């Protein structure tokens, strides 16, 4: 990703992202975004400031559902944008509601996802996803094809429980079951 970074005046931009919130977040950083190695991922996840979860489909180029979780100033902003932008909602969470969502982020154990997630029997459906977790100018990425881990589905449910719509792939989440055969929910 670093080769796509540019400095425009005093702002870092990473090209190719559909979420203006990421551009705003990166504009606040004084340093060039730096990807961390596996040893630093857990600490970064526990102290994250910004998380962007994006779904991709080769059949819907340029239309990507986005979930952004931004922790700042003692509150958590959650933004949900559907692929076609018919849903574009933001909610600010405080107290117990914010802690519940932050617990769901930590429960993903995304720090351990160092390889692309692929179900045992993949289907060439053109679907993929990625999640980028930032703490300051440091970040790590997770990604997968066809399906997402059950923990991503649980994170999306936590976003829905916070009162935001589940605007993700037409309200369908593809994820791998415990038996690794794959399923939809």
Where are the regions a protein language model picked out?
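Short, well-ordered, aromatic-rich surface patches in folded extracellular/luminal domains
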Residues: 3-61, 66, 83-185
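Conserved beta-hairpin
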Residues: 67-71
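N-terminal glycine/threonine-rich, aromatic-flanked beta-hairpin/loop signature
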Residues: 73-83
């Amino acid at each position: 990703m670093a080769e796509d970074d540019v400095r425009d005046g005093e702002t870092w931009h990473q090209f190719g992202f559909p979420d203006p919130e990421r551009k705003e977040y990166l504009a606040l950083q004084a340093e060039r975004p730096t990807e961390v190695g596996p040893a630093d991922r857990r600490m970064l996840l526990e102290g994250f400031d910004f998380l962007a979860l994006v779904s991709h489909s080769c059949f819907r180029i340029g239309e990507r559902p986005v979930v952004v979780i931004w922790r700042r100033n003692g509150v958590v902003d959650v933004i949900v944008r559907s692929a076609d932008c018919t849903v574009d909602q933001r909610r600010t969470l405080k107290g117990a509601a914010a802690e519940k969502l932050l617990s769901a982020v930590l429960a993903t154990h995304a720090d351990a996802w160092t390889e692309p997630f692929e179900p045992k029997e993949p289907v060439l459906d053109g679907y993929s996803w990625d999640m980028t977790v930032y703490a300051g100018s440091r970040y790590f990425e997770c990604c997968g094809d066809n399906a997402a881990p059950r923990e991503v589905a649980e994170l999306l449910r936590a976003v829905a429980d916070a009162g935001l719509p589940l605007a993700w792939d037409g309200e369908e989440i593809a994820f791998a079951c415990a038996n690794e055969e794959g399923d939809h929910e």
